[in-house]
């Protein structure tokens, strides 16, 4: 048996034991299939499972991260190993990236590990640590992200320490490879002929790496890119290495397990403590959210709550009562965000923006970027956005008010959302998160679940 470790791990003439392991460990239930089936939708063209391995003739091909998990089995056989990794000339970045003690320790641990995931709380400086990691490795690096906003934030941060002549970007359909670090969106890179990039980079760093397993689409895009790169070092950065649908295993198989966790205590003096204020809406369970058998349809429930006029007016009252603060209003429904925005008084509306995932055109991206920049600069005070965008690294330190307009239960969403207002900023008021809780048992249970997440984030008032 022969094992070739390159962009992927190829095992020639695998035994039945190895094939059985692949079927057991590298085939995941497709959450899209399960969701459609649960909602009674047609599932004809949706695969029931997602496979992380391939069979090619007498060989089985696995993601590189899976090698560690299967190695104990390989060790019981006579195996010949061969490595075919990228080996480019060293890069002298001539950069001194400032780090706190806990960041120094995190970078050291990741250097020693050589691959894997760095888990660090929101506001702890993951981007700073990632850039320091790339500089200390002194190798050609690909920085991979899933949004233009994150790419710009990371590029701007790197340019503070590294000469721009060493930096490049692959985004919006344009390819400009840097001699040092190239910042790329997975959407653009996945559309390229990836065979030409197989040995281009020695290091890949995936920002917000839990998004690798975000959806079957994003999993396919990230998997396609990462599995085509023969990088010796594959790293991931994330505040929440967690997914409610169990898809996080995909992330481990592509990048490796969590190698270092920055404890919450280490960053307590670097982030602000968020106060949680429960706001009882008095809204009973909507009849339209019940299926014929009396069970609650979650999708219908969220839509109905988002459309409740009296509920939205209550949220609007809380928003308008503090116009001097900097508000982030989050919802699962764009209709609700626009309803709230449209009912702002004219002078207040001039200080507000709505951003959503549909702003993908050149003009839309520019408007979204401008809205975020205006919030950063203090020119605007109200930002309406989806929970999804809040998970995608909204870096606006002056935010001090958070409104959860629709109920959430996912740990990663809560942690990321609260983290948006926990950043330190000169002259910033005590950050407050307003949690709007409705008047029925399921809503109260979801609030109790959120309270557990809040406590893990160091919040108080609960």
Residue ranges of predicted features:
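Conserved nucleic-acid-binding Ia/Ib motif block in the N-terminal RecA-like helicase ATPase lobe
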Residues: 135, 139-191
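Conserved helicase ATPase core of P-loop NTP-dependent helicases/translocases
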Residues: 152, 166-178, 328, 338-339, ...
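Conserved interdomain hinge at the start of the Helicase C-terminal
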Residues: 293-343
């Amino acid at each position: 048996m022969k094992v070739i470790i390159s962009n992927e791990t190829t095992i020639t003439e695998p035994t039945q034991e190895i094939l059985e392991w692949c079927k057991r460990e590298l085939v995941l239930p497709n959450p899209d299939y399960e969701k459609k089936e649960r909602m009674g939708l047609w599932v004809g063209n949706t695969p029931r499972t997602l496979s992380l391995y391939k069979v090619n003739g007498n060989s089985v091909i696995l993601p590189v991260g899976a090698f560690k998990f299967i190695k104990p089995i390989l060790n019981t056989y006579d195996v010949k190993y061969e490595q075919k990794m990228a080996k480019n000339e060293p890069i002298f970045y001539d950069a001194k990236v400032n780090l706190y003690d806990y960041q120094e320790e995190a970078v050291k641990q990741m250097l020693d590990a050589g691959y894997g995931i760095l888990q660090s709380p929101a506001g702890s400086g993951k981007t700073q640590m990632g850039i320091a990691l790339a500089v200390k490795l002194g190798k050609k690096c690909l920085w991979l992200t899933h949004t233009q906003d994150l790419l710009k934030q990371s590029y701007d941060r790197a340019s503070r320490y590294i000469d721009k002549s060493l930096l490049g970007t692959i985004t919006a359909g344009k390819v400009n490879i840097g001699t040092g670090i190239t910042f790329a969106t997975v959407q653009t890179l996945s559309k390229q002929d990836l065979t030409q990039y197989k040995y281009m980079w020695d290091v890949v760093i995936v920002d917000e790496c839990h998004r690798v397993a975000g959806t079957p689409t994003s999993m396919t895009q990230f998997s396609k890119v990462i599995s085509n790169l023969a990088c010796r070092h594959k790293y991931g950065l994330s505040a929440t290495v967690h997914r409610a649908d169990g898809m996080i295993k995909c992330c481990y198989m592509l990048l490796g397990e969590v190698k270092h966790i920055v404890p919450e205590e280490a960053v307590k003096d670097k982030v602000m403590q968020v106060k949680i204020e429960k706001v009882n809406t008095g809204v009973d369970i909507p009849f339209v959210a019940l299926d014929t058998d009396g069970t609650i349809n979650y999708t219908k429930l969220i839509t109905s709550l988002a459309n409740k006029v009296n509920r939205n007016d209550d949220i609007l009252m809380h928003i308008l009562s503090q116009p001097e603060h900097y508000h982030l209003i989050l919802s699962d429904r764009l209709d609700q965000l626009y309803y709230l925005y449209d009912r702002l008084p004219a002078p207040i509306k001039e200080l507000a923006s709505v951003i959503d995932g549909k702003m993908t055109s050149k003009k839309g991206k520019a408007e979204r970027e401008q809205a975020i920049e205006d919030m950063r600069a203090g020119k605007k005070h109200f930002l309406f956005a989806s929970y999804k965008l809040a998970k995608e690294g909204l870096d606006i330190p002056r935010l001090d008010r958070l409104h959860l307009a629709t109920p959430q239960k996912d740990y990663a969403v809560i942690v990321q959302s609260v983290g948006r207002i926990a950043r330190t900023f000169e002259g910033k008021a005590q950050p407050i998160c307003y949690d709007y809780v409705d008047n029925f048992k399921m809503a109260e249970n979801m609030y109790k679940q959120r309270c557990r997440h809040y406590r893990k984030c160091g919040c108080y008032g609960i």
